[in-house]
């Protein structure tokens, strides 16, 4: 458990931050589109 655990945790954290970044971009895109169409 002391071997591949930190590496796996780092990859999982990186993937989570990537998903949060994509979600933030999606929300900003929706807000900008609502401003433009309004």
Swiss-Prot record:
Under the heading Pfam families, the entry gives: PsbL
Query: For this UniProt entry, which segments traverse the membrane?
Result: 17-37
Its main subcellular localisation, reduced to a broad class, is plastid
Q: Which domain of life is it from?
A: Eukaryota
Instruction: Identify the keywords attached in UniProt to this record, alphabetized.
Output: Chloroplast, Membrane, Photosynthesis, Photosystem II, Plastid, Reaction center, Thylakoid, Transmembrane, Transmembrane helix
Q: Which SUPFAM superfamilies match?
A: Photosystem II reaction center protein L, PsbL (SSF161017)
Role of this protein: One of the components of the core complex of photosystem II (PSII). PSII is a light-driven water:plastoquinone oxidoreductase that uses light energy to abstract electrons from H(2)O, generating O(2) and a proton gradient subsequently used for ATP formation. It consists of a core antenna complex that captures photons, and an electron transfer chain that converts photonic excitation into a charge separation. This subunit is found at the monomer-monomer interface and is required for correct PSII assembly and/or dimerization.
| The protein's assembly and partners | PSII is composed of 1 copy each of membrane proteins PsbA, PsbB, PsbC, PsbD, PsbE, PsbF, PsbH, PsbI, PsbJ, PsbK, PsbL, PsbM, PsbT, PsbX, PsbY, PsbZ, Psb30/Ycf12, at least 3 peripheral proteins of the oxygen-evolving complex and a large number of cofactors. It forms dimeric complexes.
What the entry lists under HAMAP family is as follows: PSII_PsbL
Protein name (database record) = Photosystem II reaction center protein L
């Amino acid at each position: 458990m002391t071997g591949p655990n930190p590496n796996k945790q780092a990859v999982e954290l990186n993937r989570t931050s990537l998903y949060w970044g994509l979600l933030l971009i999606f929300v900003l895109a929706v807000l900008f589109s609502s401003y433009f169409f309004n």
